[in-house]
Design a protein with these regions (language model features):
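Acidic-basic catalytic patches of nuclease active cores, encompassing PD-(D/E)XK
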Residues: 452-485
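Mg2+/Mn2+-dependent nuclease catalytic core
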Residues: 208-213, 512-529
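Phosphate-binding site recognition
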Residues: 25-465
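Domain-level recognition of nuclease-like catalytic cores that cleave nucleotide substrates
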Residues: 531, 535-560
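Conserved catalytic cores of phosphodiester-cleaving nucleases, focusing on short active-site segments
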Residues: 473, 497-512, 526
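Metal-dependent nuclease catalytic cores in nucleic-acid-processing enzymes
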Residues: 218-225, 378-386, 474-479, 522-542
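Active-site metal-binding core of divalent-cation-utilizing nuclease and nuclease-like domains
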Residues: 179-183, 476-502
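Short hydrophobic targeting helices and cationic amphipathic motifs
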Residues: 9-15, 19, 27, 32
Length: 560
């Protein structure tokens, strides 16, 4: 069900239902009402995209687009006690929490016409405590305690209750008991962005330990409270294991990789074709392409998230709706920011960027984040920068890759100032000049530009110089945007790369602590150019040597 035109549409739907329940004599009028409703639904001026709107009530009352997820909401609400769901940022977690809140508060009118309207018969109201930790910058443990105390005070005011307790966790416990005694109903607890305080303290072990302890105590009071609690749901970007704040809540059901709920957040292609087909058509027209071409480009740019093996692809809802609203293909998700802790973890662990897109990992490692010093892959996956591409059943290994073009392009662009001497505002221009030189066959200008990236040999170089060189080359050539093939052998530091343009082939061999002549010789010895000999495009062979001592390119040669 798509809610498009607000109160007017809902009034017409109610009128249509009423008239239909009467007699056949007014069927014609009822049909006219239906046709008018359909015309409203097709009217592009009626479409209101819920960009930045996270309140289920606002979406339903104010006529915003809503793609019906309530059948899954009903299944969750009536199928278990405590749930945990991790999804990338801007993926609809807050809206899901708001939807659950409306359901448990018994707000039946908000769900009229949705799937749950036919499933729920009782619509019982429960005292509901919703907590969002996305409201502060957690620079100290006191900030967290203040947020928890403020939330408890707000709940007490909302329900007319006074509770005591020396700590937020004790006050939380006493509030739940008091609510149960006052209302006679069990309490619902909904927590959004549970992990924000943890993520903001990753680089401060002492603060991380304090915050972990406080959250563990706060959530831990739910374990012995079964007789007072009806339901609990926690969302976040990441799942922590050894630093878990849920270790005392051992009956928490993790549905992050549950096939039944992969469509709970985000939008599927079927939902787009069912609910947004006319809007895709409008976007296609605005961009001078066919509707099929527009679907294909939307899929390539924003689809591709998989939260379990062999499941339907999920579109990033924030990016998709922004694209349809503005009728432009842009990297909307990255405009909202990329957490710097991800880049710091990549650099801290000397992670070879050439491995991105080829990683394989087991489910137990993938679903848990232990420390800030471990592999960055679980964090990259849970944060939405990598997704499941395939699954090896025999060895129970997942193959990870970038989900779509927006993430691959945006993530690589974001890396430039962290791995090169370029500022963030210089990177795109630098890459554009690279591309122009390659297209024009200006190979010497291209190589001088590449060489200049390493001119300051001490710039942000930490740890293994070989990884530094490989990572810089990977970032730049990834940004160039052509078909690029990279082979890396850590035993001798070799990188083979082929770049193709409409008029040229560039075959590059990179060496470490050897010579440009040796690199060129290997291109000939390995016959890298042989597959392209019958192609009309001009072939350039380029040998490059990088010095781990000076951390610069100390020689390059070109052959044709």
């Amino acid at each position: 069900m798509v809610n498009k035109c607000g109160k007017e549409l809902r009034i017409l739907l109610d009128l249509d239902k009423f008239l239909t329940l009467k007699n056949a004599k007014i069927f014609v009028f009822s049909s006219l009402a239906r046709n008018f409703v359909l015309s409203l639904r097709q009217n592009k001026k009626c479409m209101k995209y819920p960009l930045g709107v996270q309140s289920f009530g606002s979406i339903r009352n104010d006529g915003y687009l809503y793609i019906d997820k309530t059948a899954l909401v009903y299944q969750i609400a009536n199928g278990g006690k405590y749930y945990f769901l991790s999804r990338p940022r801007r993926f609809g977690k807050s809206l899901l929490i708001s939807t659950l809140e409306a359901y448990f508060l018994g707000k039946k009118d908000l769900f009229r016409g949705l799937a749950i309207d036919q499933l729920e018969k009782e619509w019982k109201e429960y005292p509901t405590l919703k907590l969002s930790l996305n409201v502060a910058n957690y620079t100290s443990a006191k900030v967290l305690n203040d947020v928890l105390n403020d939330a408890t005070n707000s709940w007490c005011t909302q329900y007319g209750i006074t509770v005591n307790g020396e700590t937020p966790s004790l006050r939380f416990k006493n509030l739940i008991i008091a609510l149960y005694k006052k209302t006679g109903s069990k309490v619902v607890v909904l927590v959004d962005e549970y992990d924000k305080p943890l993520l903001q303290s990753l680089d401060d072990r002492e603060l991380l330990s304090q915050i972990r302890g406080d959250l563990k105590a706060f959530y831990g009071i739910l374990k012995p409270m079964d007789e007072y609690v009806q339901f609990g749901f926690f969302t976040g970007v990441t799942k922590f294991s050894k630093v878990s704040v849920f270790s005392d809540l051992n009956n928490l059901t993790d549905i992050a990789m549950d096939q039944r709920y992969v469509e709970l957040c985000g939008i599927t292609e079927n939902e787009i074709r069912t609910c947004l087909d006319s809007q895709v058509g409008e976007m296609a027209e605005a961009n001078g392409m066919s509707k099929d071409e527009c679907y294909e480009r939307l899929k390539k740019t924003y689809d591709g998230y998989h939260f379990e093996a062999d499941t339907v692809g999920i579109y990033n809802p924030y990016s998709l709706l922004n694209a349809l609203s503005s009728k432009a293909f842009k990297d909307y998700w990255f405009e909202t920011g990329t957490p710097s802790y991800l880049i710091e973890q990549l650099k801290r662990t000397n992670y070879p960027l050439t491995n991105l897109g080829t990683e394989e990992i087991t489910a137990d490692v993938l679903g848990n984040i232990d420390t800030i010093d471990q592999s960055p892959i679980p964090m990259l996956y849970q944060s939405g920068y990598l997704t499941l591409r395939s699954y090896d059943k025999e060895f129970e290994m997942y193959h990870l890759a970038f989900p779509n073009l927006e993430v691959e392009r945006g993530f690589t662009r974001f890396l430039i100032p962290y791995y090169t001497q370029l500022r963030s505002d210089q990177g795109q221009l630098f890459v554009a000049n690279f591309v122009k030189e390659l297209r024009a066959g200006k190979v010497e200008a291209f190589m001088k530009r590449l060489e200049s990236l390493f001119a300051d040999g001490d710039y942000q170089v930490t740890g293994n110089a070989e990884f530094y060189f490989q990572n810089v080359v990977w970032v730049i050539f990834k940004m160039i945007g052509f078909y690029t093939e990279v082979e890396r052998h850590t035993s001798d530091g070799r990188i083979d790369m082929i770049v193709k343009t409409s008029d040229y082939f560039y075959i590059l061999e990179f060496k470490l602590d050897k010579s440009a002549d040796e690199a060129l010789q290997q291109i000939d010895d390995k016959q890298y150019a042989k597959p392209f000999e019958n192609d009309s495009r001009h072939i350039y062979k380029i040998g490059v040597n990088f010095s781990t001592k000076t951390k610069r390119i100390d020689g390059w040669k070109i052959a044709e």
